[in-house]
A protein has these predicted regions:
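Conserved signature/switch motifs of ABC ATPase nucleotide-binding domains
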Residues: 61-64, 82
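Catalytic Walker B motif of ABC-type/P-loop ATPase nucleotide-binding domains
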Residues: 87-90
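Hydrophobic anchor residue at the start of the ABC signature
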Residues: 12, 76
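Helical segment within the ABC ATPase nucleotide-binding domain
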Residues: 101-115
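Conserved ABC ATPase "signature" region
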Residues: 33, 40-58, 110
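Short coil-to-helix segment of the ABC ATPase nucleotide-binding domain corresponding to the Q-loop/switch region
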Residues: 22-30
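Signature (C-motif/LSGGQ) region and adjacent switch/coupling loops
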Residues: 5, 25, 51, 59-62
Length: 185
């Protein structure tokens, strides 16, 4: 059996947690500190990931010197530095403004194309799901059950394309057709 080079999974959530006393590259390298990897190798990998997530030139910046989008990139880098096979993302861009969020969508699509990994992305934003996902699973309101599954057969990039706009409208209409929780009780 081949030896796995990366960790099985990593997470990235809406909580953009950075250690305020660490610079960006040290915050990214934090994900590797629990193992026996030498410090020089941890920093080498962290620097490579800093470049991958578009933070080249900001390696030595402290969190208070970074914008919200840049801190999101640090969090994404920390999730990627261990080379996970599965990346679990729980609304990682929900706190970002629309322009930064769109930029992060493009970055995630680019990174996904470069790395062979599965991404499980949780979002309440239908447009975000259409832009990022190859497969969408829509959940019902309480109790949460799979309501619909959709194979997204649209080429990347999708932002603003007619197919993405049409699928977003279709999925929103499907959500609006679900009876509200109040009507069912």
């Amino acid at each position: 059996m081949p030896r796995l080079t990366g960790v099985a999974s990593a997470t990235c959530s809406r909580m953009i947690a950075c250690c305020r006393w660490r610079v960006a590259v040290q915050n990214v390298a934090l994900a590797l500190e629990a193992g026996s990897m030498p410090a020089s190798e941890r920093l080498r990998r962290a620097r490579a990931v800093i470049d991958l997530v578009g933070l080249g030139g900001f390696e030595q910046a402290y969190p208070h010197q970074l914008s919200g989008g840049m801190r999101s990139r640090v969090a994404l880098g920390r999730s990627l530095v261990g080379e996970p096979q599965i990346l679990l993302m729980d609304e990682p861009f929900s706190r970002l403004d629309a322009q930064t969020r769109s930029s992060m969508h493009r970055e995630l699509v680019r990174i996904h194309a470069m790395r062979a990994m599965t991404i499980l992305f949780v979002t309440h934003d239908v447009e975000e799901a259409v832009v990022l996902a190859d497969y969408i699973v829509m959940m019902s309101a309480r109790p949460g059950r799979v309501r619909r599954a959709v194979d997204v057969a649209l080429p990347q990039p999708r932002i603003g394309t007619p197919g993405a706009v049409a699928l977003t409208a279709e999925l929103r209409a499907s959500l609006e057709a679900e009876p509200s929780q109040e009507a069912r009780t």
